[in-house]
Structures are given as structure tokens and as C-alpha cells.
Amino acid sequence: MPLTVPTMLTLLRIALVPVLVVVFFLPYSWSNLACVIIFVAAAVTDIADGAIARSTGQTSRFGAFLDPVADKIMVSTALVLLVAQYSDPTEVFAHESVFAIAAAIIIGREITISALREWMSEIGESALVKVSSVGKLKTIFQMTAIGFLLYRED
């Protein structure tokens, strides 16, 4: 399997995840803006990889598999960081717990959809769970919202 530009962009998105985590916890005033820049750069690779793959005829089963995995890794990690940012561990029933509940629902949905896609693929019905325009729109809104939420004034 040759390593194509779209696949390299997807792998770059995955590689940016630990960078995002490290920068998030840096005790510098610029780290909040750097987190947003890293997250936006990763989101841009999500837009670019598919567009490049389709326009250059470099689509592959591996790329089609890896792209949503990379999205889920990136979004799930960012949600966990947001829960860490907005949670107060001394108050179990504080309003901040809403962030943890929302993150759990979103991550649970992502895992469920991935499992459903895998199962449908195994039984030969993968066309029933292909990525739709609504799913792409959800990803755009989700990544935009997370990008805004990652920015914090210290």
C-alpha cells in the first residue's frame, strides 16, 4: 500500500493529538492560542485529505477507514481536555459536570456509530452507513465549537 498525500494528512492529524495534549497543559499564556491553532490545523487536514483523495483518484479503503478514526481520536481527546479544563473535582454535582455528561454522550455516540459501521460492513451492508452530508455538517459544527471552547483566557 503506497503512502499517499491524503493518507499522510490523516496520519498528521493523528500525530497532532499528543502535541495538542502537551501544549494544552503548558503553563504559558500563549498555550491556549497554540491549542486552537493546532486543533484548527488538524481540522483543516480533515477537510483536505478527502478532497485531495477524490480529486486525484487516491481514494483507498485504508483511507476511508483511517479518516473517521482520526476524527474520533481528535474530537474525543479535545473533549476530555475540555472536561479537565472546566471541571471542579471538589464539587461532584456542580454545573461543570454538564461538560462531562455532554462529552460522554458525544464520545459514546461516536463509538456507537463506528461499531455500527464495522458491523454493517461485516454483514455486507456498508452502503447503509456511508458518511452523509449531514454527518459531514455535524463534524464541521463539532470541530468549530471545540475550537472555540479550547480557547481560554488565563
Which ranges hold each PLM region?
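Membrane-helix interface residues
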Residues: 3, 56-57
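Membrane-interface transmembrane helices that cradle and orient dolichyl/undecaprenyl
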Residues: 23, 27-31
